[in-house]
């Protein structure tokens, strides 16, 4: 029986472990975590076969290692991996949100017959910890795989086959492309959202109306500022070059719009907003792009026949109108697989009550 070792068993690691444990009986699922309570909880809910107290021993008996730890910790583990007497053709992957630094270990690890296929499952939840793990967390989510060396083709193919039961949508790309694109669509938006929140906080003492008015669209467009600060500190530092370059682009755009406003150049200001609207409106509806200011509700459901109709039937039976409905494929920053839009906050609140048996977020 082959051994899969999870290093880090929070929401992401726990959900992957839960999925593999459910779908495979020919693997022994081991887990190591610096928080021993996570391991005990994982054993109690049956998503792992064995908890590991001795990391070194576990690494040397593993056939596959999945590092589901913050980026900085993963980098440390990878830098020390060649110190151990690992099995031949060991496959190693991770779940981090930045790839350049992690993938820099690929060539050196290959010399020791260790095959690094870096991974980024773009799924998540506002809840953390292994007790919130869900085996269906990755359904319809994009799962990015990154490797450069042709010698790792076989390992990448094996890993995709192993993870097929997650029902994720796999994309293979290069580390630099991954970090640049995620810098645009994820990392910089997190920074901008936090800047907007700081702007609000800096003035709320003298302008108490801010808190009342911010409960609407402002709260929606800055939702991602509530993400885990430790994780985003690591991501920001590990994607430093791309983030700094993109922030410089934003500075140039801010300077440009400042000048247009100062000059009262109404045609160019109009074009500024129209071009943004036109580009955003043509983005694929099912792909998570810009943040909606509608009264959206996210429902965490497995991708099974009849689930969407079950949800909509419950809502309609309570005389609540739905104005839009979409299945999300990229879910790293959106909590839930199904996004439902309502015409009022009251309708959304009533839907939450009607869907009390489901995990709902907004």
Swiss-Prot record:
It holds the Pfam family PDH_N. Its EC number is 1.3.1.12. The gene is tyrA. PROSITE patterns: ACT, PDH_ADH. GO terms for biological process: tyrosine biosynthetic process. Keywords: Amino-acid biosynthesis, Aromatic amino acid biosynthesis, NAD, Oxidoreductase, Tyrosine biosynthesis. Residues 2-291 form the Prephenate/arogenate dehydrogenase domain. The keyword NAD applies. Residues 296-362 form the ACT domain. GO terms for molecular function: NAD+ binding; prephenate dehydrogenase (NAD+) activity; prephenate dehydrogenase (NADP+) activity. Belongs to the prephenate/arogenate dehydrogenase family. PANTHER family: PREPHENATE DEHYDROGENASE, PREPHENATE DEHYDROGENASE [NADP(+)]. The lineage of its organism: Bacteria, Bacillati, Bacillota, Bacilli, Bacillales. Pathway: Amino-acid biosynthesis; L-tyrosine biosynthesis; (4-hydroxyphenyl)pyruvate from prephenate (NAD(+) route): step 1/1. NCBIfam families: PRK06545.1-4 (NF005106), PRK06545.1-5 (NF005107). The keyword Protein transport does not apply. NAD(+) binds at residues 3-33. It catalyses: prephenate + NAD(+) = 3-(4-hydroxyphenyl)pyruvate + CO2 + NADH. InterPro entries: 6-PGluconate_DH-like_C_sf, ACT-like_dom_sf, ACT_dom, NAD(P)-bd_dom_sf, PDH_C, PDH_N, Preph/Arog_dehydrog, Prephen_DH. This is Prephenate dehydrogenase.
């Amino acid at each position: 029986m082959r051994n899969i070792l999870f290093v880090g068993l929070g929401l992401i690691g726990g959900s992957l472990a839960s999925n593999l444990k459910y779908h495979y009986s020919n693997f022994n699922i081991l887990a190591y975590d610096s928080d021993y309570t996570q391991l005990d909880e994982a054993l109690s809910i049956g998503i792992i076969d064995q908890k590991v107290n001795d990391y070194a021993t576990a690494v040397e008996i593993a056939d596959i290692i999945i590092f589901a730890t913050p980026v900085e910790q993963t980098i440390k583990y990878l830098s020390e991996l060649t110190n151990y007497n690992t099995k031949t053709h060991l496959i190693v992957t991770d779940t981090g949100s930045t790839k350049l630094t992690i993938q820099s270990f690929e060539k050196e690890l290959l010399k020791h017959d260790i095959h690094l296929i870096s991974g980024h499952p773009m799924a998540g939840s506002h809840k953390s910890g292994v007790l919130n793990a869900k085996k269906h967390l990755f359904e319809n989510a994009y799962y990015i795989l990154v490797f450069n060396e042709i010698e790792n083709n076989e390992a990448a193919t094996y890993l995709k086959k192993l993870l097929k039961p997650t029902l994720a949508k796999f994309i293979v790309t290069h580390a630099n492309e991954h970090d640049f694109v995620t810098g645009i669509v994820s990392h910089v938006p997190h920074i901008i959202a936090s800047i907007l929140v700081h702007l609000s906080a800096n003035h709320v003492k003298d302008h108490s109306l801010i808190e009342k008015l911010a409960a609407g669209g402002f709260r929606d467009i800055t939702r991602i500022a509530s993400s885990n600060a430790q994780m985003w500190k690591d991501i920001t530092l590990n994607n430093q070059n791309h983030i700094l370059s993109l922030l410089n682009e934003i500075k140039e755009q801010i300077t440009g719009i400042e000048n247009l406003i100062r000059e009262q150049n109404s045609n160019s200001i109009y074009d500024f907003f129209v071009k943004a609207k036109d580009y955003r409106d043509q983005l694929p509806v099912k792909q998570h792009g810009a943040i909606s200011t509608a009264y959206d509700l996210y429902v965490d459901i497995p991708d099974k026949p009849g689930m969407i109709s079950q949800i909509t039937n419950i809502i309609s039976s309570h005389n609540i109108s739905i104005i839009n409905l979409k299945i999300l494929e990229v879910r790293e920053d959106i909590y839930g697989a199904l996004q439902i839009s309502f015409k009022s906050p009251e309708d959304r609140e009533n839907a939450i009550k009607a869907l009390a048996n489901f995990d709902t977020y907004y």
